[in-house]
Amino acid sequence: PYGANRRSRIDLLLTPAPEAADPRPIYVEVKNTTWTAGALALFPDTVTERGQKHLEELSALLPESRAVLLPCLSRSDVERFAPGDSADPRYGELFRTALAAGVEVLPCRYRFAREGVHWRGLASVETRGPAATPEAP
């Protein structure tokens, strides 16, 4: 458990090996997204108070811990990631605050094929999503 009331659960808690250069624990919050505007993946696609809380809690872990937001971009046709400001403006504000505070955002790109899921690297991060609402999934 972590967070202000120690009532939240993190998706992954990575504990560095004793020989690691950075001894801080790494808290990882995973988000899945399928909503896009062209080659831009967006999260969230609706208001998410839970997602807002996660961003606040990740920010509060700094600097004693590393905090990572790990968006899984479940579309093979995306190259970039941004907050879904048009769906949840508050999440967008908290996203930018968290990024400025040092929360790491690592959007993972994949290619889905019959033989499996293939890693395509990290998407670039944009700090603002489109002003108009693209069609939600």
Residue ranges of predicted features:
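Active-site metal-binding core of divalent-cation-utilizing nuclease and nuclease-like domains
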Residues: 1-34, 53, 115-117
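Residues at the starts of beta-strands that form the adenosine-phosphate
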Residues: 24, 66-68, 104
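A broadly tuned "polar low-complexity/structure-edge" signature
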Residues: 1-17, 56, 79-81, 85, ...
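Residue-identity detector for threonine
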Residues: 15, 33-36, 46-48, 97, ...
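Nucleic-acid nuclease catalytic cores
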Residues: 31-32, 37-52, 56-87, 109-111
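Domain-level recognition of nuclease-like catalytic cores that cleave nucleotide substrates
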Residues: 74-137
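Secondary-structure boundary motif
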Residues: 18-19, 60-64, 100
